[in-house]
């Protein structure tokens, strides 16, 4: 099973909805840029029926160098989290392996 890429999304828009390849690529890029922009502005991104992208601030915490065992601090940082919505969770849970074309 492979990964879905932005190029795959653009190809789908081209094949299914009739957009030119250039338009489809631009639409995909604009979609992701809007998500990035909102997150940069500390806004939550809610995609109904899919899920939410949130920002979370993590405090500094102790860590350890796995090679030497030396304790080193892991610096405070902001991370992006994704919480799937109920509809997405239900679709994933109802997944039927027998229907997959290999």
Swiss-Prot record:
Statement: the UniProt record of this protein carries the keyword Transmembrane helix: no
Biological process (GO), any one: DNA recombination
Record keywords: DNA recombination, DNA-binding, Transcription, Transcription regulation, Translation regulation
PROSITE patterns: HISTONE_LIKE
Cystine residue pairs: none
Native species: Chromohalobacter salexigens (strain ATCC BAA-138 / DSM 3043 / CIP 106854 / NCIMB 13768 / 1H11)
Function of the protein: This protein is one of the two subunits of integration host factor, a specific DNA-binding protein that functions in genetic recombination as well as in transcriptional and translational control.
One Gene Ontology molecular-function label: DNA binding
Highest taxon in the source lineage: Bacteria
HAMAP family in the record: IHF_alpha
Assembly mode: Heterodimer of an alpha and a beta chain.
Pfam family for this entry, one: Bac_DNA_binding
Protein name (database record): Integration host factor subunit alpha
Record flagged with keyword DNA-binding: yes
Xref: CDD domains: IHF_A (cd13835)
Entry GO terms, CC: cytosol
